[in-house]
Amino acid sequence: MTSEKKTLNITEIQALLPHRYPFLMIDRVTDYEEGQTLTAYKNVSINEPLFTGHFPKMPIFPGVMILEAMAQATGLLAFKSFGAPSENELYYFASIDKAKFRKPVVPGDQLVLNVEFIKERRGIALFNGTAKVDGEVVCSAELKCARREF
């Protein structure tokens, strides 16, 4: 028995996340299962404005941006698991623990982001996240996000 993969294109992603260029870190979602896991992609391009300063002679995608991409992936999984946001509601990145950076990410790399839902309590959801390039883990972390009105 084969199960069809659930995907999200950029239009569907923008309907769920409030982020826009240059801060939208998810290019597409290739699979997700509500309440369980989500796989997303971030294509790292030299054309991103952050590379003018990080670092001019050796461009490296900042670790905090990898974590932001993971956080956006958790927001997408949370919305798909617990319902789409109302007009004045979103998931805020609440905390990060056990973050580890294992290898630099450079222009031309494709980040494969995997997030796994662990538990939810009082509107705060806990996730495990990993980012891989060419099958190698470049970053891992535990992330929490909180659903709140703004």
From Swiss-Prot:
Q: Which GO terms of the cellular component aspect does the record hold? A: cytoplasm; membrane
Q: TM spans, by residue? A: none
A Gene Ontology biological process in which this protein takes part is: lipid A biosynthetic process
User: GO terms for molecular function, please?
Assistant: (3R)-hydroxyacyl-[acyl-carrier-protein] dehydratase activity
Q: What is its EC number?
A: 4.2.1.59
Residue stretches in coiled coil: none
Compartments it resides in: Cytoplasm
The active-site annotation reads 54
Name the Pfam families for this protein: FabA
Does the entry annotate any disulfide bonds, and if so which pairs? none
> Tell me, what does this protein do in biology?
Involved in unsaturated fatty acids biosynthesis. Catalyzes the dehydration of short chain beta-hydroxyacyl-ACPs and long chain saturated and unsaturated beta-hydroxyacyl-ACPs.
Q: Which family does it belong to?
A: Belongs to the thioester dehydratase family. FabZ subfamily.
- Report what the protein is called: 3-hydroxyacyl-[acyl-carrier-protein] dehydratase FabZ
